[in-house]
Amino acid sequence: MKKTLMAAVALMLLMMTAVALTGCGSDDDDNNTPKPDDTTPVAAVMDYSLTVGDDMLSLLNLTIEYYDADGKVQTEPLTQKSWKKSVRAKLPATLGVRLKMQLKDGADPASLAQFTAAYGYSYNGYAVSATDKVVGNVVNSGTDQTLAMQGDKVTTWLEHHTDGLVKFLYNFAANGQATSSNWQ
């Protein structure tokens, strides 16, 4: 009888151990965790491109202001014919760029027979999901301009563009929708 009782207890312990081990399952909880919707916007991206001509580089101090990923305005001198940057910021976000200009020290535009203001820009802004899928509206534009003027007209032209020759600014809401805004 003792042997039978011991065998029954051992069998019960074995069965309880088996039930406990199979009841735990795997440590992989990812199967039950809901995955984020791939259409939920999480960030805004803005790709910028600016170009300028030789006359502008030689006569003017050119400064680029843009919003960085932290929402702060950064400033960079433009010392080459082209400039490109891509900024990614967590939503909601403000993204934009502006090209400011002033005469270089000692520059005398009136002494020039002709000044050519050649410049171009493009931008492409959009919201992305966690998997970098484009969601929301896309904002983009671009143009190339060439304006020839007599040297004595350069100062007046600069005065008309004190707040920036090229400027655009967009506010991206938490839902990924972008609306245009103004530089202050």
Regions flagged by a language model, labelled:
Residues M1-A10:
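Bacterial N-terminal signal peptides that target proteins for export
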Residues M46-V52, P92-S111:
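Hydrophobic beta-strand segments within beta-rich accessory/binding domains
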Residues P34-Y67:
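Short, surface-exposed binding/anchoring microloops in extracellular/periplasmic proteins
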Residues V138-Q184:
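C-terminal partner/receptor-binding element of secreted or periplasmic proteins
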Residues P109-A130:
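Exposed low-complexity, polar/acidic, P/S/T/G-rich flexible segments that act as propeptides
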Residues Y67-K104:
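Tryptophan-paired
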Residues T4, T17-M46:
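Bacterial Sec-dependent N-terminal signal peptides
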Residues V9-A18:
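Hydrophobic helical h-region of N-terminal Sec-dependent signal peptides
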